[in-house]
């Protein structure tokens, strides 16, 4: 009975260590993914939002339309 209890306690401790380590690893992977994609990539944005920017001139819009034909 004592042996089973010791094995159970060691298993519980190892499982807790695994869960804490996995959370750290998954957290770091998620941070890396977010830094690669960036803020705009994770937002639900239309790709044509820049066309409505007031800083774009008519020539810029014409060039963009030619590029995407």
UniProtKB/Swiss-Prot annotation:
Keywords: Amidation, Antibiotic, Antimicrobial, Cleavage on pair of basic residues, Fungicide, Membrane, Secreted, Signal, Target cell membrane, Target membrane
Transmembrane regions listed in the UniProt entry: none
Expression tissues: Expressed by the venom gland.
A GO biological process held by the record: killing of cells of another organism
PTM sites of type Valine amide: 37
Signal sequence extent: 1-23
Pro-piece positions: 41-69
GO cellular component: extracellular region; membrane; other organism cell membrane
Location of this chain's protein in the cell: Secreted; Target cell membrane
Origin superkingdom: Eukaryota
Entry function: Amphipathic peptide that possesses relatively strong activities against Gram-positive bacteria and a fungus, but has very weak antimicrobial activities against Gram-negative bacteria. Also exhibits very low hemolytic activities against human erythrocytes (64 uM induce 21% of hemolysis).
Annotated family: Belongs to the non-disulfide-bridged peptide (NDBP) superfamily. Short antimicrobial peptide (group 4) family.
Protein name, per record: Pantinin-1
The species this protein was found in: Pandinus imperator (Emperor scorpion)
